[in-house]
Curated annotation (Swiss-Prot):
Segments forming a coiled coil: none
Gene3D superfamilies: Glutamine Phosphoribosylpyrophosphate, subunit 1, domain 1
Source lineage: Eukaryota, Viridiplantae, Streptophyta, Embryophyta, Tracheophyta
Plastid is among the record's keywords: no
Family from the record: Belongs to the peptidase T1B family.
Keywords: Cytoplasm, Nucleus, Proteasome
Protein name per Swiss-Prot or TrEMBL: Proteasome subunit beta type-3-B
Pfam families: Proteasome
Gene Ontology biological-process annotations: proteasome-mediated ubiquitin-dependent protein catabolic process
Function: Non-catalytic component of the proteasome, a multicatalytic proteinase complex which is characterized by its ability to cleave peptides with Arg, Phe, Tyr, Leu, and Glu adjacent to the leaving group at neutral or slightly basic pH. The proteasome has an ATP-dependent proteolytic activity.
Amino acid sequence: MSIFEYNGSAVVAMVGKNCFAIASDRRLGVQLQTIATDFQRISKIHDHLFIGLSGLATDVQTLYQRLVFRHKLYQLREERDMKPETFASLVSAILYEKRFGPFLCQPVIAGLGDDNKPFICTMDSIGAKELAKDFVVSGTASESLYGACEAMFKPDMEAEELFETISQALLSSVDRDCLSGWGGHVYVVTPKEVKERILKGRMD
């Protein structure tokens, strides 16, 4: 078993019309044993920028603390929030810096940039970025997430339709992966508001 599969995870981000959604499962396990059912994989950097981290749970928490620290330094120096593209480059640089002993996680970054244009990207554990204009996935359920998202995604969805689409994709995918699941955690971000919702899924 790969170390990336040790704790199990499923993270997906999807683009809508001037909005985006990012969702994850809530299970923290040690291989097939469930440890917690309310694990937080998605974290807010600021109101228009979120990061989801799949992979080894210890590295997820360590990397998140380092990213919050770097973003606060940026805010103090620049007196503004970081743009999503800048933040993605920062994450990539931090991961690549540790390439010989990498953080064992795969980030999914989603944010609203200039003119409220949504930005999503993912990268591997050493910071190789993969940009997308529709959706990005990571985690142990990524194979089934790709299939569900390709079947359900359509461009320029409004916020409510986007929430419904990403939720259905996530729930149907984690049912096909025994290392992730136990409900879902969804953020839908528009220029005016952030909606956070908890999904109830199969509890096994």
